[in-house]
Amino acid sequence: MNSILSTFKPDASGKPPKQVPYIPWLKLNDGNEIPMLAYGLGTANYKTGGAGFDEKIVDNTVMAIKAGYRHLDGAEVYGNEEELGAAIKKSGVPREKLYVVAKIAGNKKQDTEEAFARTLKKMGLDYVDLYLIHAPFFADSDEELQQKWADFEAIKESGRARSIGVSNFLQSHLEVILTTAKIPPAINQIEFHPHLQHGDLLEFHRKNNIAVAAYAPLTPITSDVESPVRTIWSNLSKKYGVSESVIGLRWCLDQGLVTVTTSSKEERLTSYLNHLPAIKLTPREVSEIAEAGKSKHVRGFWKNKFEPETRAK
């Protein structure tokens, strides 16, 4: 599959703590590279419709950038593209040092070019590093999904999106667009954690050289499920001298997955940057967590669209 070719050191203009070590990058199938740890603008930073400009979201994002995060994962449906753009400007870090992700809403029909132009305007940017179809659920036919992907190919060819990809796609959705695609998706961002491992989907990605990004990786901690994974994470946290959250994120990274996390707490964000590069789980530990996770199925997002189809995965 894709391979880690380089490392990322937080730029001095962002004034990160001196002790922040390197974060790896992953080479995508289009030749571009993506930082493997992302700061997400969803969940805690999600803004409900009609809410005004939120300075707290700006401050949270600036904090993440100054801590050393360069991969910023945004989306139209998060409702905070203006705040993301403001944070980029306020951070003082040059645009070219940042990796900005945007997503078109995947649950409604809209003109792709108009939606993308609106996103760029809200963020005050000329381009994004990665543009994703947030979900396939807007499409009533294979042809509609294929046309949306053709729209994305045109945006990439225009230079306004360095890479293009999808999110929340199952193998069946990927097969539809690959049938007609001139440019394959660079990445598929999916909910991924020990309690939702998607069966053979990761192997399909490897065979087709499509990278995977994991969101909600800490579900065993953040959900109310009694997770057997927690016992393993607790034991490993003591072994490696890090938090359970670091173990959970490391489990994804050690499988070659780009990993999206978020927090409004600077200490937690800095801890991830400090500790994640310092440890590596053994193959046996990765496998042990995976097997424990399979004992319970938990999906936190898009339940009404996926269940019960993926309950066993």
Residue locations for each model-derived region?
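CE4/NodB-like, metal-dependent polysaccharide N-deacetylase domain
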Residues: 113-133, 154-158
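Acidic (Asp/Glu)-rich catalytic clusters
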Residues: 28-30, 65, 85-95, 117-126, ...
